[in-house]
Amino acid sequence: MSQVNMRDMLKAGVHFGHQTRYWNPKMGKYIFGARNKIHIINLEKTLPMFNDALAFVERLAQGKNKIMFVGTKRSAGKIVAEQAARCGSPYVDHRWLGGMLTNYKTIRASIKRLRDLETQAEDGTFAKLTKKEALMRSRDLEKLDRSLGGIKDMGGLPDALFVIDVDHERIAITEANKLGIPVIGVVDTNSSPEGVDFVIPGNDDAIRAIELYMTSMADAVIRGRNNVAGGTEVYAEEAAAPAAE
């Protein structure tokens, strides 16, 4: 199993939290101190927690389970889409639609509509329509692809969520909690770790930090899939153990 090291995290700026006045007391135990009114995250705590999360993801992937990557804010979306595509994982990079997990039956119907429109665009159906109707369907296709393109091949609910910025993606976390889906999350000093099974205390804004998290997670998925072992549906119970206090 490949692990992230302290130097990687320092270079990426994982240790830089938010301004001290915005801190969340629930993250106090992960804060080393403050510099220029910015909280500094204790990487000696982050390092083992990050590597535990990577090990969990690798074992999930080894059991042929699906890990959904979620990062919809501007600094995260592009990186999330690129790394999820690299490891063949479902992802949400634009906007979390309410009910994406808890109302998956409706989401699945929208995915079917997306696939139908993709087929029509490819087989020449659009060319046979009036210009107005073709334009309407093209716009519908574009809208659906932006919202659901990352999960159209998921084929069912994911077995875990990896979330960048737990405050920004709180609806996704709440839905996962309701369904008992384990959540791995990057939690900054201004956020609450509640509802997150595998907390990664760290900077959730810096692009280099987000690249480190996403690249490492994608690598863990690839390693797991390259070392498939018997396909056991494991680790939902394991996720309950390290839950945030």
Swiss-Prot record:
The keyword tRNA-binding does not apply. One of its GO terms (biological process) is translation. It comes from the Bacteria. CDD domains: RPS2. Pfam families: Ribosomal_S2 (PF00318). InterPro entries: Ribosomal_uS2, Ribosomal_uS2_bac/mit/plastid, Ribosomal_uS2_CS, Ribosomal_uS2_flav_dom_sf. One of its GO terms (cellular component) is cytosolic small ribosomal subunit. One of its GO terms (molecular function) is structural constituent of ribosome. Keywords: Ribonucleoprotein, Ribosomal protein. Belongs to the universal ribosomal protein uS2 family. This is Small ribosomal subunit protein uS2. The lineage of its organism: Bacteria, Pseudomonadati, Pseudomonadota, Gammaproteobacteria, Pseudomonadales.
